[in-house]
Amino acid sequence: MRIEEELKLDYSDVLFRPKRSTLSSRKDVNLNRTYKFKYSNQEWSGIPIMAANMDGVGELSLAEGLSDFDMITCLTKQHDVKKIKKFKKIKYFYKNIALSIGI
């Protein structure tokens, strides 16, 4: 057995100080961001929050719902390509899905 004697930090050792803001409400915050990808020269605009494959998250129905808010859904590699292509509104939210392949 190995005993580690180094000092370890805990949650009680960390303090986050909020930044001062001129906003009167959290509803006034704009979460939309635009990213330009260096090597493809493509841009993506939306809210940089991703739903990934965790216990049923990352399904086509979730992608449709999150796309209304310009959020990204990572679909699993188990999805059949034919099923993705046949999904009715795929063109509407296609820019907000990513395929995870698990390399």
Predicted regions: what they are:
Residues 1-103:
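Active-site entrance/lid segments in N-terminal catalytic domains of soluble metabolic enzymes
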